[in-house]
Amino acid sequence: MTSVDSQPDLSAAEAVLGAHVRDVMDFPKPGVVFKDITPLLSTPAAFGVVVGALADLARGLGATTIAGIEARGFLLAAPVADRVGAGIVPIRKQGKLPGRTRSEAYALEYGTAVLEIHEDAVPTGERVLIVDDVLATGGTAAAAHTLLRGCGADVVGLAVLMELTFLSGRDRTGTLDVTSIMKI
């Protein structure tokens, strides 16, 4: 776990992110307010501020690999890894990776889903930061954490753009150190 003192100042990134997230009502189903990050992605300066904040976090944690969770986590993990000079590991939906994989099921609102990672994705002891767009219920993050630990990784944390606090996802991430740029 990291101390509060070692965390980068995320206030600038939070302000930029807040100005570049659009609420989409009733998507993907009635009653849901979807947080759309495409305005952030389409504004290079704003995207750069947010990626820079995530890269600063990764550096501070000593991450040598960045793991991105399908699909929007890929959009963040790749530029963060590039800025840090780290490798990138994709954590994908079931059936999307060739070769030998590890699998982890997690609960959805109705049913289950499965995430996969290559068996040889990270060497034992590799310092990995998981990156995703949103922490909601915590199921996806917990599954990603389990997969990486199963490969022998030293998972240094989870970094997300937004944390939907009303869903209590942080409670399901166990010992995983979570950093969110913005809490909703």
Swiss-Prot record:
It is found in: Cytoplasm. One of its GO terms (biological process) is purine ribonucleoside salvage. Pathway: Purine metabolism; AMP biosynthesis via salvage pathway; AMP from adenine: step 1/1. Disulfide bonds: none annotated. InterPro entries: Ade_phspho_trans (IPR005764), PRibTrfase_dom (IPR000836), PRTase-like (IPR029057), UPRTase/APRTase (IPR050054). It catalyses: AMP + diphosphate = 5-phospho-alpha-D-ribose 1-diphosphate + adenine. Signal peptide: none annotated. Keywords: Cytoplasm, Glycosyltransferase, Purine salvage, Transferase. Its EC number is 2.4.2.7. It is an enzyme of class 2 (transferase). Belongs to the purine/pyrimidine phosphoribosyltransferase family. Homodimer. This is Adenine phosphoribosyltransferase. It comes from Parafrankia sp. (strain EAN1pec).
